[in-house]
Amino acid sequence: MVEADRPGKLFIGGLNTETNEKALEAVFCKYGRVVEVLLMKDRETNKSRGFAFVTFESPADAKDAARELNGKALDGKPIKVEQATKPSFSTPSRRGPPTSPRSRGPPRGLRGSRGGGSSRGQMPLKRGPPPRSGGPPPKRSAPSGPLRSSEMGGRAPLSRERDGYGAPPRRDPMPSRRDVYMSPRDDGYSGKDRYDGYSGRDYGSSRDSRDYGPPPRDYSYRDYGHSSSRDDYGSRGYSDRDGYGGRDSRDYSDHQSGGSYRDSYEGYGNSRSAPPARGPPPSYGGSSRYDDYSSTRDGYGGRDSYSSSRNDIYSSGRDRVGRQERGLPPSMDRGYPPPRDSYSSSSRGGPRGGGRGGSRSDRGGGRSRY
């Protein structure tokens, strides 16, 4: 890649450090008109570095001078005279440093777009409908709920995606979410966790509650529970939230029967949901799903919205969500536990589970009332 410098420019090397421009010009001007004599000097000491460039007006004169003077002695030292070439280092030095930053730059951009952009970008698309339910949570709910449930294959990509996007963010955003929205609820969970190992695991993480949010609108808690559990907890989440998801399926069938769903929900929602319900949680839109059945202190209004959301996943689930999105506390749920009959009637399996529901509502209501 050595290219000749401008025609008529000669490189003179091996100079005596005492030789100066004037001496060079005196020697070379014999062969033709010299346009420029450039003696390379050390910047600090200003002494000759032993080479120079002499430019002739006519390239032919330069060739003659190079032919005649190459190897001749000047000031006691043989000099090397040849057609000057553009210094090879200058090309890389000019081109190189910029390219390395540039090359570094795009990767950063790509990394950014790959990590943040694509995964985050896709998420917004998926996030589309759910955001109504309350801001941040949908990020998770949307992919996890509909997508996860609809396509089992999606699990791996989503989890990977979430890892790509979520692994660090889990540490950052989620804690913040947990702090912002869930701190009371977290305490509620962890505390309840201890005496309610079952629901504690399910609701234990803000992510769970977050995951529960939009689904009322998203299609079904079942889809949602499984997916979120898979996302958040991997294998344990599966079993845990299988605890939840299983409860979901249990919720579906048993809720209709009015039996064990009430059981699981009570043992589950009330003991745990009651304390958390008191705090800020309702204002947390995403948690509305959690509020839907959990924050309701009685756990029955919650199940109301839950059962009806079962019946109409969209209508009452969304109503409840809307109410809590607007920040109105579930007045009925929170203010005073509903009467026993509201509980039994609330569940679809009213007649069958009525007696059991009533007594349980007593027990659950008392517990939720503290």
UniProtKB/Swiss-Prot annotation:
Q: Where is the composition biased (Pro residues)?
A: 127-140
List, alphabetically, the SUPFAM superfamilies matched: RNA-binding domain, RBD (SSF54928)
Q: Where is this region: Disordered?
A: 69-370
In which compartments does the protein localize?
Nucleus
Q: Where is the composition biased (Low complexity)?
A: 87-110, 303-316
Question: What UniProt keywords apply to this chain's record, in alphabetical order?
Answer: Developmental protein, mRNA processing, mRNA splicing, Nucleus, Ribonucleoprotein, RNA-binding, Spliceosome, Transcription
Q: Where is the RRM domain?
A: 8-86
- Where exactly are the transmembrane stretches of this chain? none
User: Is Nucleus tagged as a keyword?
Assistant: yes
Coiled-coil ranges from the UniProt annotation: none
Q: Where in the sequence does UniProt note compositional bias of the Basic and acidic residues kind?
A: 69-80, 158-196, 219-254, 317-326, 359-370
Q: Name one GO biological process term.
A: protein homooligomerization
Q: Which CDD domains match?
A: RRM_RBMX_like
Which GO CC terms are listed, alphabetically? Answer: catalytic step 2 spliceosome; euchromatin; extracellular exosome; nucleus; spliceosomal complex; supraspliceosomal complex
Read off the PROSITE patterns from this record. Answer: RRM
List the GO molecular function terms: chromatin binding; mRNA binding; RNA binding; RNA polymerase II cis-regulatory region sequence-specific DNA binding
Q: Which domain of life is it from?
A: Eukaryota
Stated role: RNA-binding protein that plays several role in the regulation of pre- and post-transcriptional processes. Implicated in tissue-specific regulation of gene transcription and alternative splicing of pre-mRNAs. Associates with chromatin. Associates with nascent mRNAs transcribed by RNA polymerase II. Component of the supraspliceosome complex that regulates pre-mRNA alternative splice site selection. Binds non-specifically to pre-mRNAs. Required for embryonic development, in particular of the brain.
Question: What protein name applies here?
Answer: RNA-binding motif protein, X chromosome
Name the source organism: Xenopus laevis
